[in-house]
Amino acid sequence: MSEINISAVVVKELREKTGAGMMDCKKALIETSGNFEEAIDFLRKKGLAAAVKKSGRIASEGLTAVKVDGLISAVIEVNSETDFVARNKQFQDLVKDIVNLAIIAQNIDTLKISKMQSGKSVEEEIIDNIAIIGENLTLRRMDILEISNGAIGSYVHNEVVPHLGKISVLVGLESNAKDKVKLEALAKQIAVHVAGNNPQSIDTLSLDKSLIEREKKVFFEKSKEEGKPNHIIEKMVEGRIRKFFSEVVLLHQNFLFEPKLTVAEVIKNAEQELSAEIKITKFIRYALGEGIEHAEKNFADEVAAITQC
C-alpha cells in the first residue's frame, strides 16, 4: 500500500485520543486511508489502544455556567480565546448575566436577542465585550433541564467563581419524596458523579445503538485475530458489553461516593429510605470546548520527525 500524506495534527490527535504510540498511530491512519474513526478501531483491534476515551477533546477556553431556580435550570457555555480572559471579572459577570437570562429564554436563539440590564441584547453585549476585552467571544450553546416535582442537582468543576467553571453538570430527579433535603443531596452527589465519570446515557435503552454495535465489532474481531473459537468469542463479547455498559451508562456505573454500589443500587436504597420512587429524567454535562477543533501551532520534534518522513 502506498503511503498517503498524514498530517502531524491528525497523528497527534489520534495519539491523544487512544494512548497508542506515534508510529502505531501513523500506521493506523495509513492503513485506513486517513479515516480517523477507522484508525481508532484499527488500533483497538490490534490491542494497541485502550477503549476510546469518553471525554470529548478540549479545544477552547472560556467558561461554562449553571443556574438553578426551583424546578427549572439552565447551563451555558461561553467561549473565549484564552484562559486569561476566563479569569477576567468582566467576562465572568457577563457569563453570570447570560445564564440568568437562559432560564427565561429557554433556547439559544431567544437568548441571543434577550435584553440585558444595559438594554442591549445578549448578542450586542457580547460584541461590546469583544471590543473591550480584545478577544473573540462566543455564546456557543445552552440547555434547559426542567422537572415537575423532585430535585435538581448542579455541580461545577474547577470553579473560578461560584457556578462558573470548566465543567458544568445538571441532574434532574423526579420524585414525590417529602424529604427534599435528602433528595437534593442525592441529586448533588449524582451531579458530581456525572462530572467525574462522564456517562453517555442514563440507561442502556437510551444509549446510541451504533456505539454498542461498534464495541461488539471491535471486540469480536480482536478476539478472532487471537484465534479464539466463535462460541468462546460470543460469551466474551457479552461480558465485554456488560463492562462497556458499566463504563458509559449512568445507572450501571459504580457510584463515585459508594464504589461498591452502582448508581441504580444507590437510587434503590434512597427510594427505600425516602419511601418514594426516584427517577433520573435527564442529565446535562458541559465540558468546556468539548468537540471544538482548533489548529495546533507547535508540535514536539518527534511528531515532525515521524510524520514528515
Curated annotation (Swiss-Prot):
Bilayer-spanning residue ranges: none
The entry's keywords: Cytoplasm, Elongation factor, Protein biosynthesis
GO molecular function, one term: translation elongation factor activity
Gene Ontology cellular component list: cytoplasm
Main location (coarse class): cytoplasm
InterPro entries referenced in this protein's UniProt entry, alphabetically: EF-Ts_dimer_sf, Transl_elong_EFTs/EF1B, Transl_elong_EFTs/EF1B_dimer, Transl_elong_Ts_CS, UBA-like_sf
Subcellular location: Cytoplasm
Region feature (Involved in Mg(2+) ion dislocation from EF-Tu): 82-85
Keyword Cytoplasm annotated: yes
Family to which this protein belongs: Belongs to the EF-Ts family.
Function: Associates with the EF-Tu.GDP complex and induces the exchange of GDP to GTP. It remains bound to the aminoacyl-tRNA.EF-Tu.GTP complex up to the GTP hydrolysis stage on the ribosome.
NCBIfam families the UniProt entry points to: tsf
Stated name of the protein: Elongation factor Ts
